[in-house]
């Protein structure tokens, strides 16, 4: 939308409405004249919106941005309908004017000033939806009938293959665990039997050493003691 002094973009202030969240919308004002143009922004609901700046000056052949912020709302209007409106007033200012020079009297028609006014609507739009996740069973090669069932419960067809696969994996893991336990048990039993046999031989050597007249310890006795210690350490480490 445009008037004789300024171009206004956009013509409607659109806010992607979300509860409990501040939302901003930019309004661009373009001066298409060789004059300094003062502007003022009003709203029908000043407690709901914050406008920065709400007054200002647009230099000749240049543009300015106005940021309109809607305060966080606790409730959503029915069907996202909004009746709020904004009014943009603009008037030719003196050369070299600054925002500090803008006064309320400049926009008074009673004082004989030529004031241009443009009404802007507020439009609420739904926020963009997140992308939908890819449904299971939609890969190439799957049967078209798998997506629709007679009673409308399409999820029944996609959940069954996943459950079966998980159950097979669990069974495989359980079989491997049982096999490992069996193997370790057999190794432990073999080690225990070997330990018992060595213990018997050690007892026999002890009896023979007692009958020996010499007080020295036979070399075989020392060797067996060391071997038993190694075997016991191996068993304790494996179990």
From Swiss-Prot:
The modification Phosphoserine is found at residues 132, 164. The chain crosses the membrane at residues 216-236. The modification N-acetylserine is found at residue 2. GO terms for cellular component: cytosol; endoplasmic reticulum; endoplasmic reticulum membrane; plasma membrane. Keywords: Acetylation, Coiled coil, Endoplasmic reticulum, Membrane, Phosphoprotein, Transmembrane, Transmembrane helix. Residues 140-156 have a biased composition (Polar residues). Residues 169-215 form a coiled coil. Residues 1-215 are cytoplasmic. GO terms for biological process: protein targeting. Its main location: endoplasmic reticulum. It is a single-pass type IV membrane protein. SUPFAM superfamilies: PapD-like (SSF49354). The modification N-acetylmethionine is found at residue 1. Residues 5-125 form the MSP domain. Pfam families: Motile_Sperm. Belongs to the VAMP-associated protein (VAP) (TC 9.B.17) family. Interacts with ORP3A. Binds to VLG at the endomembrane system. Vesicle-associated protein that binds the oxysterol-binding protein ORP3A and allows its targeting to the ER. This is Vesicle-associated protein 1-2. It comes from Arabidopsis thaliana (Mouse-ear cress).
């Amino acid at each position: 939308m445009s008037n004789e002094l300024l171009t206004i973009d956009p013509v409607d202030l659109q806010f992607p409405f979300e509860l409990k969240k501040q939302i901003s919308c930019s309004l661009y004002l373009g001066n298409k004249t060789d004059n300094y143009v003062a502007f003022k922004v009003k709203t029908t609901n000043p407690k709901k919106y914050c406008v920065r700046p709400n007054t200002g000056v647009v230099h000749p052949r240049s543009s300015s941005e106005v940021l309109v912020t809607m305060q966080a709302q606790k409730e959503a209007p029915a069907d996202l309908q909004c009746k709020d409106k904004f009014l943009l007033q603009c008037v030719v200012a003196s050369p070299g004017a600054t925002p500090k020079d803008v006064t309320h009297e400049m926009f008074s028609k009673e004082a004989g000033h030529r004031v241009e006014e443009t009404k802007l609507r507020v439009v609420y739009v739904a926020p963009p939806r997140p992308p939908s996740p890819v449904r299971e069973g939609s890969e190439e090669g799957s049967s078209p009938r798998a997506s629709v069932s007679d009673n409308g419960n399409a999820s029944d067809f996609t959940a069954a293959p996943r459950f079966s696969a998980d159950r097979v994996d669990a069974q495989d893991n359980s079989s491997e665990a049982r096999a490992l336990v069996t193997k370790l048990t057999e190794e432990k039993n073999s080690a225990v039997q070997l330990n018992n046999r060595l213990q018997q031989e050690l007892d026999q050597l002890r009896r023979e050493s007692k009958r020996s007249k010499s007080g020295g310890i036979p070399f075989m006795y020392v060797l067996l003691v060391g071997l038993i210690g190694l075997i016991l350490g191996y068993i304790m480490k494996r179990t």
